[in-house]
Swiss-Prot record:
GO terms for molecular function: actin filament binding. GO terms for biological process: actin filament depolymerization. InterPro entries: ADF-H, ADF-H/Gelsolin-like_dom_sf, ADF/Cofilin. Transmembrane segments: none annotated. Keywords: Actin-binding. This is Actin-depolymerizing factor 10.
Length: 151
């Protein structure tokens, strides 16, 4: 299969998946289990072969720090660990998978990220919510809080 001049084929004509290295999976597990990171930002490497960790945020970093770390003109995947107080006044934590595909990013990048999103998301067991964002308003902190409070 060819997508915008990029051939996506494996042996026997099956789709070739972009690899998720152990280091990328470990960064997610460190966020989920050990609370070492507040967020992890992933990108598809320049060879379009692997989904790699681009940046991690320390537990004390804010949501604004996270959103400022996303490029304004290129796609990324991210996981964010949202701590919040629920409507019934309980402290909770929910993990969000965010597919960031700004409207100004290249069509080729949008396509490659869209094609590999489900495969990557499947590797991250324990994500509570998924958000697909093309604009900062799509992933405003209040949007996340609203989704988290509905559970």
């Amino acid at each position: 299969m060819e997508i915008l001049g990029f051939t996506v084929m494996g042996g026997g004509g099956s789709p070739a998946w972009i690899e998720v290295p152990e280091k990328s999976k470990s960064a997610f597990w460190e966020l989920k289990r050990r609370k070492v990171h507040r967020y992890v930002i992933f990108k598809i490497d320049d060879r379009r072969e692997e989904i790699v960790v681009e940046k991690t945020g320390a537990p004390g970093e804010s949501y604004d720090d996270f959103t400022a770390s996303l490029p304004a003109d290129d796609c990324r995947y991210a996981v964010y660990d949202l701590d919040f107080v629920s409507d019934d006044n309980c402290r909770k934590s929910k993990i969000f998978f965010i597919s960031w595909s700004p409207s100004v990013s290249r069509i080729r990048a949008k396509t490659i990220y869209a094609v590999s999103r489900n495969q990557f998301r499947h590797e991250l067991d324990g994500v509570h919510f998924e958000i697909q964002a093309t604009d900062p308003d799509d992933m405003d902190l209040e949007v996340l809080r609203g989704r988290a409070n509905r559970t």
